[in-house]
C-alpha cells in the first residue's frame, strides 16, 4: 500500500473523553464532563422546537448553498451573503483554508506554540511546513510571527482567544498586526470563542484587509457542538475559492435550521455569556483557594497547573470528572460548567491533590 509520506507524521486528533465511554469503563452513576468547552446550558429552546418541526423533511438533501443560514448570518453580521462560507464546524473551515492556499511542500504555515492542535493537523495533512512560534507568557507573540514571514509563508493562524491557553490579544494589537502583515499572506483569526469577549474585530474588517479570514462556530456559546456548524467571513474572492473546494451538502439540514433559530435567540446567547463569566470567576476563585497557578482566560475554559497532570486527570476520571489534558507540561484544561458542576469538580480536585501531597505551583 502506498500512502502519502506526510501521513506518518500525523497523530490523530484526540477528543475529550465521552461521558458514555467513562460509564462503560467504570460503571459510575454520576459523571460530569468539563473537557470539550461545550455550553453547560444545553440548547436554545427555540432551536429545539425548530428541530422537532423539521424532522419530517430529513429524507431530503439539505440546501447545499445554505441560503437561509447565510441570509441570517449576513443580517446579523451586516455583511453580504457572498462573504460567508458555511462548514461542518469551523474545523472544516480551517481545512478548506489550508487546501485552498497551500500548494507545495515548500509552503509554510505559521502559528503559535500552545495553539489549537488542528492548525498542525491540517498543515501536516497537506504536506506543508509548520513554523511554530514560541509563545510569550502563554500568548501569541505577534511580532515574532511577523519576523518569521518569508517568501514561502502562505497562512498565519491566530486563535483569539487562544485554545488551550484562553489568552486574548487586544484589538489594537490585532489591528497593528494586520497592517504590517504582507498582503499576499492569508491571516486567519480563529474566533471560536469570540462571543465571550468584547472584541470589535468583526466582519467589517474584511473590507479593510483582503487577506483576512475570520472563522467562527456555533459549537461554543451557541450550544450546537453536536450538530457541527461553523463559518468563515472573508472577501468575495476568498469566499469563492473556499466554496470551490467545499463538499456539497456539508452542513446538514437539521444543523442549518438549529443554527438559524439559535442565532435568533438573543436571550439564550446572553444567558450563555453570563453563566460563563460567573463560572470563570468561580473556577478562578477555587484555584486561588487551592493555591494553584492558572492562566487568566477570556474563553469558556481555564488551564490550570498541577503536579503530575496525567495522574490527576486519571484520578479525576475515577471520581466521575472528565477534564482535558493539554500539550502544556503539567496543565489541565477545565471547561466552565454549571455552578453545581464547577463546585463538584473543585471538591474532587481538592480530594485528589490532598491524596497526592500536591506541591502548589505559582
Model-assigned labels for residue ranges:
Residues 100-158:
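PLP-dependent aminotransferase-like
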Residues 65, 211-287, 292-295:
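PLP-dependent aminotransferase class I/II
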Residues 30, 80-84, 105-108, 152, ...:
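Short acidic capping loops at alpha-helix termini that bridge into adjacent secondary structure
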Residues 277, 285-319, 336:
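Conserved PLP-binding catalytic core of the aspartate aminotransferase-like
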Residues 1-60:
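N-terminal "arm"/small-domain region of PLP-dependent enzymes with the aminotransferase-like
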Residues 62-108, 126:
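Phosphate-binding glycine-rich loop
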Residues 315-319, 325-362:
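PLP-dependent enzyme catalytic core of the Aspartate aminotransferase-like
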Residues 124, 142-151, 164-187, 191-221:
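Active-site pre-lysine segment of PLP-dependent enzymes
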Amino acid at each position: 500500500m502506498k500512502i502519502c509520506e506526510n501521513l506518518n507524521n500525523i497523530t490523530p486528533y484526540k477528543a475529550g473523553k465521552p461521558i458514555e465511554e467513562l460509564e462503560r469503563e467504570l460503571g459510575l452513576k454520576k459523571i460530569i464532563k468539563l473537557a470539550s468547552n461545550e455550553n453547560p446550558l444545553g440548547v436554545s429552546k427555540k432551536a429545539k422546537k425548530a428541530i422537532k418541526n423539521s424532522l419530517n423533511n430529513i429524507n431530503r438533501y439539505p440546501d447545499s448553498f445554505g441560503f437561509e443560514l447565510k441570509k441570517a448570518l449576513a443580517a446579523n453580521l451586516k455583511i453580504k451573503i457572498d462573504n460567508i462560507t458555511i462548514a461542518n464546524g469551523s474545523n472544516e473551515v480551517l481545512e478548506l483554508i489550508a487546501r485552498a492556499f497551500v500548494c507545495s511542500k515548500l509552503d509554510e504555515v505559521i502559528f503559535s506554540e500552545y495553539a489549537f492542535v488542528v492548525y498542525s493537523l491540517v498543515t501536516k495533512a497537506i504536506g506543508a511546513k509548520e513554523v511554530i512560534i514560541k509563545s510569550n507568557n502563554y500568548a501569541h507573540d505577534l511580532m515574532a510571527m511577523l519576523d518569521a514571514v518569508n517568501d514561502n509563508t502562505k497562512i498565519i493562524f491566530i486563535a483569539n482567544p487562544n485554545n488551550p491557553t484562553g489568552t486574548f490579544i487586544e484589538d489594537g494589537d490585532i489591528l497593528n498586526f494586520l497592517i504590517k502583515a504582507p498582503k499576499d499572506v492569508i491571516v486567519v483569526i480563529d474566533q471560536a470563542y469570540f462571543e465571550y469577549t468584547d472584541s470589535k474585530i468583526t466582519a467589517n474588517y474584511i473590507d479593510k484587509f483582503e487577506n483576512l479570514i475570520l472563522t467562527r462556530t456555533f459549537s461554543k456559546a451557541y450550544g450546537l457542538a453536536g450538530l457541527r456548524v461553523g463559518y468563515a467571513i472573508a472577501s468575495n474572492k476568498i469566499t469563492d475559492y473556499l466554496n470551490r473546494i467545499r463538499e456539497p451538502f456539508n452542513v446538514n439540514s437539521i444543523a442549518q435550521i438549529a443554527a438559524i433559530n439559535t442565532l435568533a435567540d438573543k436571550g439564550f446567547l446572553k444567558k450563555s455569556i453570563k453563566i460563563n463569566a460567573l463560572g470563570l470567576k468561580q473556577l478562578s476563585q477555587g484555584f486561588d483557594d487551592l493555591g494553584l497557578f492558572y492562566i487568566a482566560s477570556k474563553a469558556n475554559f481555564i488551564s490550570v497547573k498541577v503536579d503530575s497532570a496525567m495522574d490527576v486527570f486519571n484520578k479525576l476520571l475515577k471520581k466521575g470528572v472528565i477534564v482535558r489534558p493539554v500539550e502544556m507540561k503539567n496543565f489541565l484544561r477545565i471547561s466552565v460548567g454549571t455552578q453545581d458542576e464547577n463546585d463538584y469538580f473543585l471538591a474532587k480536585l481538592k480530594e485528589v491533590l490532598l491524596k497526592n501531597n500536591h506541591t502548589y505551583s505559582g
